[in-house]
Amino acid sequence: MVFPQKSKEKLRYLKDRWDDQVAKSLDEAELLRYRSNLLGSDLRITNFGGGNTSSKIEEKDPLDGNKATVLWIKGSGGDIGSIQRKGFATLYLDKLHAAAKRYRGVEFEDEMVDMYPLCAFGNNTVAASIDTPLHGFLPFAHIDHLHPDWGIALAAAANGREKMEEFNRRFEHRLIWLPWQRPGFELAMMLRQAISASKGCDGIVLGGHGLFTWGETQRECYLNTLTIIDQLGQFVAQHVEEKGNVLFGGTVSAALENQRELAIDIFPFIRGRVSTGQRMIGSFSNSAEVLRFVNSAEAQRLAHLGTSCPDHFIRTKIRPLFVAWEPSSMLNGLREKIDEALKVYRDEYKQYYDSFAAPDSPKMRDMNPTVVLIPGIGMFSFGKNKTEARITGEFYTNAIHVMEGATALGTGKAHDVLPQAGPAAKTEAFAVHENYVALPPSEAFRIEYWQLEEAKIRRQPPEKELSRRVVVVVGGGNGVGEATARQAAERGAHVVVADRDAEAAKKTTAEAQKIAGKEAAMAVSIDIRDREAIREAFREVIATYGGMDILINTAAIFPSSPDGVIQDGQWGTTLDINVTANHRLADELAPILREQNLDGSIVLTSSANAVVPKRGSEAYDVSKAAVSHLVRELAISLAPKVRVNGISPATVVKGSTMFPRDRVIASLTKYEIKFDFKATDEQLRGLLAEFYAKRTLTHCPIDPEDCAAAILFLAGPESRCTTGHLIPVDGGLTEAFLR
């Protein structure tokens, strides 16, 4: 049925994005994909990766040619906002119902997952979601199970069932309530029984969990879902507005005016501390909703209670780290407060694991928090990559919305029996504060360390050698720097393309993003002659990723001197850019790496010219000789945490900005190499590169990609025992052999 309130005019917060022109050309499976993408495109409807959508579709059985009812359901670990047709699992509905006969009770819940592949329709190998029986056992053609903040606020309220009835009366709905139960076959049985006993109900609120809605057509299901969530929003928002400034006990800490600058100052320190188990990438939020929470009187207690929705604490862990710090314009004492709070957090996490782990539980994971809350500043979130770090922050923002809504729904009345309580957990197991109900730690553990969640982790592809690392490539807009940025992206790094040429940097960044993802690469403008410009570029990197791990500099100049005479200004500029700038870069990076207290790496670019003197290139040759020695000096001064190495390439012509057309033509003329004036720049560079190659033992032209491979070998973990070293990349120049 379609509710009478449903119309575009009746939606206050959400938007009906359904397009009949698009929908009419789609088959049922594509309509499911379309419906899912529309719902998942709005984080108010469900969080990233959260919830599930399904359809029961009549299809021709490939085995016997007869019609079969097939359950299409989002595959395990998928995101409905981006899912495509191939991301859905398909199961024979009758086989899924038959599997229910094998169910031996809640203690044997996990063994039922092995039944899902036996129910697969056709050759579909997509892992079915743990929610599969929940959708399969409900007698509706199309079902949405979502985690809207407004819905979870109701589900996590101590008076949630009472408020649900009030909502039903106001909006003429027939929602029903189920107590908390971990997803799986047991919950599916509870759903089936509840629907059977409540004819005409139009939705289900799962205590401490989420919302179920449905429809007999794809369109009807979408509208039913949209309407109920929007009306829940109206209901909860009214209570929030009525509470006003007294929400969360009111504000006790003022937001600092320089909060972003302070966040950048402290970010590397926090990143280093939460990376003691495994290196993390960071994200920062100082949104109004985050600041209202972290600056409130009840923030510390509510944060310690933990989150309520299973989807939340898979990423945020059972609780965030709240740092009880009195905000000031300086960071006085904050580092000490963070260290103290972290010790307590790790001890509590170990106690949590030891209290609930069974002999067959997965081993304890990283004890560090993934969310850090600091009054006056905001929220720092962490993950294995930028996207995960950002999403983790979004999930905790969802948790803040839930706590806001649940506390706003409160009337000040205590509840002897919680509506979330049921067979899985009694009232006394739940923690309650200001009407907000957090899941019992035992139930949180059963989700976080569920074998099915462990299986999701194991299905993820192995991480690459530069995963979780932030690599800054100075001079990344062209030539060797461009090749290095691309290869770093291929090896899993978060790549920062730093260049004076903003357009070139953007071009390389776009290439790196195609390889590693949009959030895994960024461009920054930098002038290595200016210490303040370097500092600002590095702070921009910290603001985005939380810190830095590897610095690579390929930027250099070769002074033009047609008459063979180097002017004083050229000499000074060459040494400033080719030598002193390397020292500036290292000098600005050093305090960042010290704050992180993680292993770091620097790779500089010297040249074969450092040991092979040539007429007319004195300034360049001397500068590169100095770079070679600077590598050794920095290796000593930055040890033991930071390794410093370099490469000594022979002439790299391909893609090099140091070889403009006029210089290439001059060199071709000098060496009496025939060429066509109509040839392109790269064709001319190719002729010169071939000439240089013939002077080496291998006769191989030195390409940017060759230099990049050597650079990244030195930068990465494969060379963890190498520092103060230079690798020749010269094809075999005998006069440049190391002696």
Question: How does the language model describe each region?
Answer:
Residues 607:
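Residue(s) in the substrate-gating loop at a strand-loop-helix junction
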Residues 1-471, 483:
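Glycine-rich flexible loops
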Residues 562-575, 692:
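Substrate-binding pocket helix/loop in short-chain dehydrogenase/reductase
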Residues 564, 612-618, 699, 717:
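Active-site loop immediately N-terminal to the catalytic Tyr-X3-Lys motif
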Residues 639-643, 722-724:
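Short, small/polar-rich loop/turn modules that mediate ligand/substrate recognition or access, typified
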Residues 586, 623:
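Active-site helix of classical SDR
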Residues 711-712, 723-739:
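Short C-terminal tail/terminal secondary-structure segment
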